[in-house]
């Protein structure tokens, strides 16, 4: 199992004195450090208007990271595809794949925050259809050598051929999923799947249930399943005081960042987001003692390793680590990244663990 760096650039906290610019600089440094300590990949989320996160252009940050690394794989987590024209998305990520020497993994999703849709004049209510049509177009634009035309419900164009083409054929593509329709889409298209354990536990019962559903659905469509990945909030704690602080940090993230961003109001949540109502209700009620291995990696190196062995057994090929969550200081984030790769990663045969220099 491989391990990567992950962030949603959460900075929306009531008493936060860390500037957006400083956090983007920290994230960039952490992504570079991921290669130094032996991580496999860096996955950077897309958020707009500081509604949850402050990093709106993961493609630009990853282009900088690409120029300053040699082997680290580079990915958005995720590209909010309905906010962008699929032609432009195909061009941007194909270009980064070329410049990085074929190191891009492309992950996309619908997002979940209506506040990010309104200024772009994109329909939040119709974004399932926009997303599906857009994803199929991006993949077609990458894979087709000649010119293509398209006349769909949401996008129409004639005689288009993008350049450059990606080095990787096919370019690895993942669907970010909180729901059964997204799993269905990933399976139907033969895409990989990336999930959040806390949401998987609430919606499906756990990661194994998600993996089973994905494999069953892939078989139904006659497709070989893609690669399974998950993100995990990560906190090292060696005593009760450290564990209590980590739990408080995680709860604060849910309360101040996630709940305001999720479509949890029964009066306004579109039909394709109704499952978020239950997730938000549970997050409102969550207590520090409710944080288990279903949602976080928290505790000693041995405890974290034990949890990840179960994730590996469920069929997941990579875990991306959300270490810099909840205003965790930059130096602590780097220390925990290095500790993970030194004390946890070596227990997994395919990891590329190296000691921090």
What are these regions (language model features)?
Residues 3, 34, 38, 46, ...:
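Conserved, mostly hydrophobic/aromatic
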Residues 5-7, 128-162, 203-316, 349-357:
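An alpha-helical appendage that flanks or caps ligand/catalytic pockets
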Residues 52-76, 130, 337-353:
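Alpha-helix-loop-beta-strand connector modules within alpha/beta enzyme cores
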């Amino acid at each position: 199992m491989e391990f990567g760096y992950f962030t949603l650039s959460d900075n929306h906290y009531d008493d936060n004195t860390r500037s957006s610019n400083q956090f983007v600089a920290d994230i960039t440094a952490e992504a570079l450090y991921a290669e130094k300590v032996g991580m496999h990949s860096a996955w950077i989320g897309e958020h707009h208007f500081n509604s949850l996160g402050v990093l709106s252009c993961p493609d630009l940050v990853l282009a900088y990271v690409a120029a300053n690394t040699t082997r680290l794989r580079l990915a958005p987590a995720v590209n909010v595809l309905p906010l962008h024209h699929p032609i432009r998305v195909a061009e941007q990520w194909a270009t980064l794949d070329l410049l990085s020497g074929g190191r891009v993994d492309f992950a996309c999703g619908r997002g979940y925050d209506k506040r990010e849709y309104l200024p772009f004049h994109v329909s939040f209510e119709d974004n399932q259809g926009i997303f599906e049509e857009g994803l199929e177009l991006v993949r077609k634009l990458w894979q087709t050598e000649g010119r293509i035309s398209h006349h769909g419900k949401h996008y129409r164009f004639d005689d288009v051929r993008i350049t450059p083409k990606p080095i990787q054929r096919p370019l690895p593509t993942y669907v970010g999923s909180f729901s059964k329709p997204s799993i269905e889409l990933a399976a139907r298209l033969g895409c990989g799947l990336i999930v959040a354990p806390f949401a998987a536990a609430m919606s499906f019962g756990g990661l194994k249930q998600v993996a089973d559903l994905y494999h069953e659905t892939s078989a139904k469509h006659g497709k070989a399943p893609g690669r399974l990945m998950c993100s995990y909030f990560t906190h090292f704690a060696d005593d009760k005081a450290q564990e209590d602080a980590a739990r408080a940090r995680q709860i604060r993230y849910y309360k101040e960042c996630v709940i305001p961003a999720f479509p949890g109001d029964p009066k306004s949540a579109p039909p394709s987001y109704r499952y978020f109502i239950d997730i938000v209700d549970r997050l409102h009620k969550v207590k520090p003692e409710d944080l288990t291995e279903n949602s976080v990696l928290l505790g000693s190196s041995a405890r974290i390793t034990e949890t990840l062995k179960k994730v590996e057994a469920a069929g997941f090929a990579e875990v991306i680590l959300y270490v810099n969550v909840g205003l965790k200081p930059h130096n602590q984030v780097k220390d925990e990244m290095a500790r993970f790769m030194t004390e946890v990663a070596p227990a997994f045969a395919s990891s590329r663990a190296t000691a921090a220099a």
